[in-house]
């Protein structure tokens, strides 16, 4: 929007005490009027009045001070602006609101000097004016706006006001500093935020009796003390006054009594600004282009305007606040008595709909009682205190709300946990989502019944419930994931056992290749997202855990199936297969020692050829099986198995070594003993067979005893006995009991011979010798009896 010359002239008077060329003067624009409305045409004004593109090349200076202290005059004389000044014949408010003007030149000791930067000057309505009286709201907001948007804030003060509290506007500055700290102070916590504001204290009507240094010391001390008494937010307690502000002083003589010295003081201040350039510093600049500054200024005013800390109540409002507070207290106490009556004990089986209606009735009755007594007071205060009472009642009823909400959540959560466990991994993610959604909806619907039409928020409870649900789901997900891992490891272990047992039937050089291939097939199949809704990280960890456990199972299963006892049994079985049976699987009968020794050597070699294959897990290419993980690492075992091994076992474990060398030696020794024993036993049977009666003897006996043989056949009794005896011998032979029967018969015969010899000796020896021996036996027996009695 382009501003016309007429619009600018309407808002700024051309009257001024400044004797400068009127062609250089720039009319001011009112950026905030006395009704607190912000003018959005500032940027158009700046673009119209500045000679070139402003960009970042600008400075903002504002003035603050009491009414009728010559603030506008100071700005006009120093910056050659055209702000309205007071008519000396009629002391009254001149500047209303906040005005902004462009400074074409700055007054210096060398004349009017053009600044290298564009200088924009703000004239702020004076404080303590009779026009506004006790209403200090605009004064505070205007001062805070100037402080927030300016690089240099000129505080215009008479010498006689230095050291005063109200006279020096310390009370107003304290309020402004506190609100500025609460609104904009947190930005100071950001890194590399060195922004400050220069407080330029211009001491007016300085007569020179008190040195400027002494006045500066007094004023600075007052500022420091005031800063120390501010109510600061906790996170800003450590910040100092110097972190936000720099302070500089400049004294001016009396304008009327010492006009020449006054002008010289103005020019010296101009030198400090644009000639010596000692007052403009980079950290004072807002570091935004001019169009950004105008937007920032508008946002600052919006925030300041809506801030309640700058408002002060009137007497009428104070009365309304006191009476309404009194009414609120009385009504609330009456509400508490009803509250104690209804909620003295917590009902376990509560009807949430009825409880919600009771909440509404109790609150409505209390608010109606308040309305009857407080509605005649100031409307704003009445509504504010009504909202306060409503909040107190809501907070008290929320205590009951929270108790029942917790019981409800606990009950439903317990049911949810049972339903979750019952899923047992079937479409887990889908069903879990349905269950959790149903649970939350049920809780929200139930709590809404007693939420006082939404005044009692259930967000905190539902948020906590959601966290509980998530924690429960996460816990069950871990259980289900571990179950999947363990089941998969168990399945792999079973397949691995079958594969190894199959290979043990006929071990060869490719035995471990076949076992490893089967292992890899099951090993590589495990993966995916498992359908549990777990995160990628959890899935990856589960896969890692499965792989580690799988290699542990590989190690354990191989050592379980190929222990030294089972290895010894396997060697013996293989030896027996070659030593005791022929190629057709029939038992072998050795007739000579040469055949025995040859078969023994072959069988022994056949048995021992699998020993190096089974004791070391080695592939056909000669390489040992090496797992992807070091399953003996204690940290990995603790991570994946949850088992911490703090033993001091310093033995080097070898994954491929199924049977250790020591165990291998033990197996070989036992195997040698066993097969040697079988060899000796078999050889003894051959020798016995060789030392038996020759077969031709039986032929001779048959020829010589032919008559007796025929006599037996012709005799029915002898023939029957022969058949029975032959059948008995055949049965014993068939049952492989012939040798034991012969042994029993031989021992029986030996006993019979011994008894016969004894009887024969008794007959042949004299009776007196027999009698003597019997007496000796009796005497010996008696002695034995006596010894036993002793």
UniProtKB/Swiss-Prot annotation:
Its organism's taxonomic lineage begins at: Eukaryota, Fungi, Dikarya, Ascomycota, Saccharomycotina
Provide the residue positions that the database annotates as binding GTP: 65-72
**Cytoplasmic side stretches:** 1-692, 738-790
Please report which protein family the annotation says this sequence is part of: Belongs to the TRAFAC class dynamin-like GTPase superfamily. GB1/RHD3 GTPase family. RHD3 subfamily.
What biological function has been recorded for the protein in this entry? Cooperates with the reticulon proteins and tubule-shaping DP1 family proteins to generate and maintain the structure of the tubular endoplasmic reticulum network. Has GTPase activity, which is required for its function in ER organization.
Sorted UniProt keywords: Endoplasmic reticulum, GTP-binding, Hydrolase, Membrane, Nucleotide-binding, Transmembrane, Transmembrane helix
Q: Which GO terms describe its cellular component?
A: endoplasmic reticulum membrane
This chain's protein is named Protein SEY1
Q: Which CDD domains match?
A: GBP
